[in-house]
Amino acid sequence: MDTTAVASKGSTNVGSSTDTLSTSASLHPSMNAGSVNEYSEQQRHGTNSFNGKPSVHDSVGSDASVSNGHNNHNESSLWTSGIPKALEEATKSKKPDSLVSTSTSGCASAHSVGYQNIDNLIPSPLPESASRSSSQSSHQRHSRDGRGELGSEHGERRSAMDGLRDRHIRKVRVSQLLDLQRRRIRPADHTTKDRYGIQDFNFLQTLGTGSFGRVHLVQSNHNRLYYAIKVLEKKKIVDMKQIEHTCDERYILSRVQHPFITILWGTFQDAKNLFMVMDFAEGGELFSLLRKCHRFPEKVAKFYAAEVILALDYLHHNQIVYRDLKPENLLLDRFGHLKIVDFGFAKRVSTSNCCTLCGTPDYLAPEIISLKPYNKAADWWSLGILIFEMLAGYPPFYSENPMKLYENILEGKVNYPSYFSPASIDLLSHLLQRDITCRYGNLKDGSMDIIMHPWFRDISWDKILTRKIEVPYVPPIQAGMGDSSQFDAYADVATDYGTSEDPEFTSIFKDF
């Protein structure tokens, strides 16, 4: 049986939604002091609310997901275990890079920011697709066959036709792949209720804490495998009017089944608490890795973005909007693949739109800030923010002043560093599009507009989905299954789990 781990770092979120648990990142060095884009964890998770005061929810989001090693994978790391020493030395001497400032209208100006480009620290690229190489060889073949000017034109036309044909074949293959993955969903009558009890687990340590409770690393007393259990206090959920969101989280996780989404194995409750048994992700948060590296090389960011895209496409096809995409909610399993965790903000939708103001301020779409009804397109906006932050080391609209942050988002003007490739800028300009009728992911072809974008030309989507691609980073898991070294240590406190005295709210949470 495959199990994977769950514990995601919470951040200050705005609006009313299920307050899930939090786990701090391992290391968050401040970005280049004195830079016009200084950005630290404290600033990211500080006074982020519409009134400039700390949010009512001190932390929102947590789970922990990691594989227990029961899948066969043919993978090896492009990095050595852990963060290379060369990376640490390189980041000590950063040279400023110029930026190109653009908005949806294509304006440009010059700025500077001190972030070190670390592309040379990743020795090997991700595999390139066969379609790209075949197109290039076709172009070379027909160029050689040309005789004079007419022959050259003929060769160029043939090369262009071959390119269109290869693109069409690639699009058909990816469409078939997406159709297959979208059908994987648990039956509607699948239940998680009372599959386990408190007596089935040995509680080892705390992985994260939050407003509603804690996340614990546990070991099963039956199969000896490791899991993460999220414990939520019923009274706090009721007092903060989060009953519906909590029940939605349980229902959604009980239905979804995807390689890049955490698994909910079962739920149970005692008199005072709700328990959710999920994967344990031993590799820690992507946020922690990003802070250690300052920013990712393009090939690395592209790899993680591809796994997120497949997961979002799956959720959207099954009428689920995620609403809280950010590096803190992306965990690495022991093999280096992502797991999306923390579905406290996720919502089932069909033809109706969402209205709740929720999410992480830096990642909020403009339609959410404007208090307008919104749909799944908000997730694709967040994808654009995620890709930008992975490439640059900071989100595109960041400001220390919360109100200025929201103004920046509504204005939609993005400053692209000079080291961003033209393809990445083009993709981001279509994702960070204020007009949802023009935003990639929300158009006629849906996620295919993103998947088929030239920035992903060298991505083999079938290998991504089947996890048969070489990962850019393998977490340094040294103690084997159950290794929690990639998470911060928390002080354990006495708990009264398992009590049966004075049961509260049992009828409200009857599906747990």
Curated annotation (Swiss-Prot):
Residues 201-456 form the Protein kinase domain. The active site is at D324 (proton acceptor). One of its GO terms (cellular component) is fungal-type vacuole. The modification Phosphothreonine is found at T356. Residues 1-79, 118-166 are annotated as: Disordered. Pfam families: Pkinase (PF00069). CDD domains: STKc_PKA_like. Residues 1-15, 32-52, 62-79 have a biased composition (Polar residues). It catalyses: L-seryl-[protein] + ATP = O-phospho-L-seryl-[protein] + ADP + H(+); L-threonyl-[protein] + ATP = O-phospho-L-threonyl-[protein] + ADP + H(+). Residues 16-27 have a biased composition (Low complexity). ATP binds at L207, G208, T209, G210, S211, F212, G213, R214, V215, K230. Residues 143-166 have a biased composition (Basic and acidic residues). One of its GO terms (molecular function) is protein serine kinase activity. GO terms for biological process: adenylate cyclase-activating G protein-coupled receptor signaling pathway; adenylate cyclase-activating glucose-activated G protein-coupled receptor signaling pathway; negative regulation of gluconeogenesis; negative regulation of induction of conjugation with cellular fusion; negative regulation of transcription by RNA polymerase II; positive regulation of microtubule depolymerization; positive regulation of protein export from nucleus; signal transduction. Its EC number is 2.7.11.11. Belongs to the protein kinase superfamily. AGC Ser/Thr protein kinase family. cAMP subfamily. This is cAMP-dependent protein kinase catalytic subunit. It comes from Schizosaccharomyces pombe (strain 972 / ATCC 24843). The lineage of its organism: Eukaryota, Fungi, Dikarya, Ascomycota, Taphrinomycotina.
